[in-house]
């Protein structure tokens, strides 16, 4: 785009079209400060299974995900802020509007590390950075379909089917929460144990392996969960 930095009206118009300013102000609420938060998320699945919920560990982790941001970036933007004090005004990313158009088909592109969603007319409506497949659960090939969508799912750890974590050789139910193995969303595919899901660690998307085949940030997985429905096709590209 060839807007001059002095063209204030033009810049405002372009920003409004794309969803407004890059940043917004946000006032921390008593609910934000209260949580509840967990002190830390254990690595071990046996210990995870004993918790009531795999919640966020801090106000900054919760707010970073709510505003589609890296947690360290949120802290760097607000070096003086006391995030635990209700009424504190912080600067957050203004991520624009959520996509609301229903999805007709999805492409999971391993080469580009990207999930793309298309509407019924074939227009691309969303593109999300993704981690696709792992050594434990290589991603499927060909075309599959969404079978169901679960928000805030618990996770069944079954060492006989998927992978083995530590010394855990029994089936475990891992409680729900944004810091669970599949984050806060599970979009099941018609191939058993495979799905599109969230992540406990958004900074590793596109870099680390996925336990359920296609991993997105929790915020992208939540957006996608609201616009997909059972029967939507998911095509895997190498």
State what each model feature region is.
Residues 1, 27-68:
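Primarily a LysM-type cell-wall glycan-binding module
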Residues 1-33, 75-106:
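Extracellular LysM carbohydrate-binding repeats and other cell-envelope/extracellular binding modules
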Residues 1-5, 58-84, 123-126, 219-222, ...:
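LysM (lysin motif) carbohydrate-binding repeats in extracellular/periplasmic proteins that recognize
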Residues 46-64, 103-104, 173-177, 184, ...:
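Second-shell loop/turn segments in exported
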Residues 100-199, 230:
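Gly/Pro-biased beta-strand-loop elements
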Residues 184-227, 233-235:
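Active-site scaffold segments
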